């Protein structure tokens, strides 16, 4: 497997830390050892997150093509668009962001705080669109690309989550390689890796990266899209493509893609009671914040799997904390009492 043949523009500090979640582990019985890999601490650009790791492999292409404007898309509280805006500012590029109404939630400040507020401060051209949530290419995004061209600019297209992009899976192949280096230092290997999945390329990259040492099926995706069939298809397709790109040496099949569908409801962006319990429990036991859209749902999934005895006793489980905390501000009413 050869990731090094792809150019990479450094946007992160380096390997992200792995933190023991000892108090949470003990609270859940102490039979499973939980750790977090802190992708939420990976960069100094507007709080970073998993998309920043992915963008390291997209940006060289944007620069090589002479593009002057990054154009991306997400929901109103999209972490993706905030990270794209930050990277564009760092590079001295323009940025156009399509922010669709992906979440069936209303709060007086939802479209004025958190991620979207940061994107505006970073200088992005933020365009609100009423369209609802779906996975795949969006007309509003294609219209934004065309508007840049019509104005004489040269856009670089970054789809939702960086996912449906030829280079979108590479960053998290690198994540797996990084984990292996850290495991050598720690003196043990993780038995399972838990990660949130929606647009798919984060888990897809992990599946390919961990397939290199036989652990593809130990990557447990927690669906947060509430459209798991679409998410599963996208993970599998991106993983197959990424495996070919990096020369994995074997095909990725549906057996390699594990996606737990139990924790994503009631719909994308709306927390359930378990999500909220997990957010508060992790915060109060570990001082680690998660969000209602993504990480709260994957944290809920991991907690319930421990409670249900789904991890064998003595397992070491690595939780991939992908970021997303700025979105908490958009849910201020839900958390008005903590």
UniProtKB/Swiss-Prot annotation:
At what positions is N6-(pyridoxal phosphate)lysine found?
51
Q: Which reaction does it catalyse?
A: 1-aminocyclopropane-1-carboxylate + H2O = 2-oxobutanoate + NH4(+)
> GO biological process annotations for this chain's record?
1-aminocyclopropane-1-carboxylate metabolic process; amine catabolic process
UniProtKB keywords:
Hydrolase, Pyridoxal phosphate
- Any Pfam family matching the protein: PALP
The cofactor required is: pyridoxal 5'-phosphate
S-S bonds: none
CDD domains attached to this UniProt entry: ACCD
The protein's enzyme class: hydrolase
Could you say which EC number(s) this protein's record lists?
3.5.99.7
* Active site (UniProt): 78
Which molecular function terms from Gene Ontology are attached? 1-aminocyclopropane-1-carboxylate deaminase activity; D-cysteine desulfhydrase activity; pyridoxal phosphate binding
Family matches, as PANTHER family: 1-AMINOCYCLOPROPANE-1-CARBOXYLATE DEAMINASE-RELATED
Q: What is this protein for, i.e. what is its function?
A: Catalyzes a cyclopropane ring-opening reaction, the irreversible conversion of 1-aminocyclopropane-1-carboxylate (ACC) to ammonia and alpha-ketobutyrate. Allows growth on ACC as a nitrogen source.
Do you know which NCBIfam families this protein is assigned to?
Answer: ACC_deam
Record's subunit section: Homotrimer.
Q: Which family is annotated?
A: Belongs to the ACC deaminase/D-cysteine desulfhydrase family.
Protein name, UniProt field = 1-aminocyclopropane-1-carboxylate deaminase
Which organism was this protein described from? Paraburkholderia phytofirmans (strain DSM 17436 / LMG 22146 / PsJN)
The gene designation is: acdS
């Amino acid at each position: 497997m050869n990731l090094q043949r792809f150019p990479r523009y450094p946007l992160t500090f380096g390997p992200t830390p792995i933190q023991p979640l000892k108090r949470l582990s003990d609270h859940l019985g102490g039979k499973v050892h939980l750790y977090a890999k802190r992708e939420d601490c990976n960069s100094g650009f507007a709080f970073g997150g998993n998309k920043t790791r992915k963008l390291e492999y997209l940006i060289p292409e944007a620069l090589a093509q002479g593009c002057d404007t990054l154009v991306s898309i997400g929901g109103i509280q999209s972490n993706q668009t905030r990270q794209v805006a930050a990277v564009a500012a760092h590079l001295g590029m323009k940025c156009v962001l399509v922010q669709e109404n992906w979440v069936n939630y209303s709060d007086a400040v939802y479209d004025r705080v958190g991620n979207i507020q940061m994107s505006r401060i970073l200088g992005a051209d933020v365009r609100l669109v009423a369209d609802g949530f779906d996975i795949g290419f969006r007309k509003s995004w294609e219209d934004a690309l065309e508007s840049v061209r019509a104005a004489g600019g040269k856009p670089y297209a970054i789809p939702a989550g960086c996912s449906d992009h030829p280079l979108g899976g590479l960053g998290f192949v690198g994540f797996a390689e990084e984990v292996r280096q850290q495991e050598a230092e720690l003196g043990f290997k993780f038995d399972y890796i838990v990660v949130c999945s929606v647009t798919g390329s984060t888990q897809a990259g992990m599946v390919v990266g961990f397939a290199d040492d036989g652990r593809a099926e130990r990557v447990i995706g927690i669906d947060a899209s509430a459209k798991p069939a679409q998410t599963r298809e996208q993970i599998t397709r991106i993983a197959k493509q990424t495996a070919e790109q990096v020369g994995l040496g074997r095909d990725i099949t549906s057996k390699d893609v594990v996606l737990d569908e139990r924790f994503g409801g009631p719909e994308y962006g709306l927390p359930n009671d378990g999500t909220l319990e997990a957010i508060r429990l992790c915060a109060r036991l570990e001082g680690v914040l998660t969000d209602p859209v993504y990480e709260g749902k994957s944290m809920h999934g991991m907690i319930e799997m421990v409670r249900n005895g789904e991890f064998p006793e003595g397992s070491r489980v690595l939780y991939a904390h992908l970021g997303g905390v700025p979105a908490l501000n958009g849910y201020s009413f839900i958390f008005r009492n903590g």
